Amino acid sequence: GLGDDRPIWQDDVPTEKVLEKSGKFISKAYQKEKDIILAATDGKAGHFTSTLWMEGSALVEKGYLKFPEGVTMVFADTAPTQLYGDEYDRVPREKDGKYGIYYHLQYYGCGPHLVPQTGLKKLYYNMKLAYDKGDRDYFIMNVSNVREFVFELKAYAESAWSMSRYVPDDYLNRYCE
């Protein structure tokens, strides 16, 4: 299934107190990490991200995990399905926050590897969902084999730069011209 990438509590369901303590601990670690980076770069580092997936999303949703100011919160799809989990809709967005997405076109563990299968409509669905949510500050895509995924890579780039231009059928026609 999901390989080794899983929440810290997958095999042992924690209490709310444990979740709260975990969130506070991780929040302090994020702040310390940002402070170290800023010190090491004489304050020149200007872009910070944190990718939420499973436990990160759950801790943010409950208000236990807080990020330092200026950190872009990045939401990841569940790689095998290439869809966002239920937590995607439940995590609150702050008015002045920065948000983005991490999306898989390819996944070694159990998704497409040599043959693309995401399809333009699924890609459109996910990109439109992110765009409509306001998660537009950061886009990153995971694809391990570029050669087999050029068609989808171009579609992803086009939709990230101009969602209004990206219509699956129109893209297909332009690509084939």
Where do the PLM segments sit?
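Gly/Pro-rich turn-and-neighbor structural signature
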Residues: 1-95, 177
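Structured mid-domain segments that build the active-site/substrate or prosthetic-cofactor binding neighborhood
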Residues: 75-81, 87-177
